Amino acid sequence: MLFINLRTLLNNAALRNGHNFVVRNFRCGQPVQDKVQLKGRDLLTLKNFTGEEIKYMLWLSADLKFRIKQKGEYLPLLQGKSLGMIFEKRSTRTRLSTETGFALLGGHPCFLTTDDIHLGVNESLTDTARVLSSMTDAVLARVYKQSDLDILAKEASIPIVNGLSDLYHPIQILADYLTLQEHYGSLKGLTLSWIGDGNNILHSIMMSAAKFGMHLQVATPKGYEPDPSITKLAEQYAKENGTKLSLTNDPLEAACGGNVLITDTWISMGQEEEKKKRLQAFQGYQVTMKTAKVAAPDWTFLHCLPRKPEEVDDEVFYSPRSLVFPEAENRKWTIMAVMVSLLTDYSPQLQKPKF
């Protein structure tokens, strides 16, 4: 107890001697009042989280980024913990951000590909979940089918995190929102303009944007609209939160007045055989300065990467309005926050950002 109190006093004294720090009283291992409790939960889709719970993960992301990147602190919050990483699909940002982030916090990530493990093939999903539960503290799985994640979560006794599935990509959206909060200072009232495929990224935005008070304007080619059941739920969220949701097949209509222009790959992993058909269907959906002309004066651009020139031209992608590289970096801070929130009792020290 004496050591903890002394450490607290030294931490507070050091912070008071800083210049631009805004902090709350902080005591290691002691939750702040009214702290959101996420420990032990799964993160399969943002549909399962309230606006306050998502905001808490973003707050924790900002806190870790500030303490580690700006202040240079070492925070071994995951020391002694291990993470199983199951990847059925290739990855750059998801793998790098998770491996480096988990290790930076003192934990041990273990990467498994389809050469190492075959979900439901060489071993049942039930057996895999139980074995992983006995050897790791959490699992991040990047899979083809959301249903596989659901089974893993049902059978495992440890948190399961969706690293991407056919329906959702929640950890990408956390990085997007952190990036927008850093740029605009707040998320409430922003209009997001989605121009592209009705895919897992869009689904995750639809399950969360209204909870922040953000409006969403979606343009997809005919036949490539978002999942109808997800659209129905998104309409309910918009009604509950007093936000607007519109769907169209006209890219300029969706871009009109938008603060944030967002697109993604037109051809996701597993859709390579549809390439010719999709390229034809998405003609006219490239984000260009012509698209930006009808957007809000303060427009910015997001793309989760990797990017192809037919999706967005160089003029927009490499412009000062493009936030794609800060967005990519924030994948690391947000996945770190997810792991800390699901595996520890740590409370943010930084003042809560405005959302």
Curated annotation (Swiss-Prot):
InterPro entries: Asp/Orn_carbamoyltranf_P-bd, Asp/Orn_carbamoylTrfase, Asp/Orn_carbamoylTrfase_sf, Asp_carbamoyltransf_Asp/Orn-bd, Orn/put_carbamltrans. Carbamoyl phosphate binds at S91, T92, R93, T94, R95, R142, H169, R331. The active site is at C304. The modification N6-acetyllysine is found at K71, K89, K145, K222, K232, K239, K244, K293, K308. The modification N6-succinyllysine is found at K71, K81, K89, K145, K222, K232, K239, K275, K290, K293, K308. Residues 88-96, 111-125 and 247-283 form flexible loops whose positions are affected on substrate binding. NCBIfam families: orni_carb_tr, PRK00779.1. This is Ornithine transcarbamylase, mitochondrial.
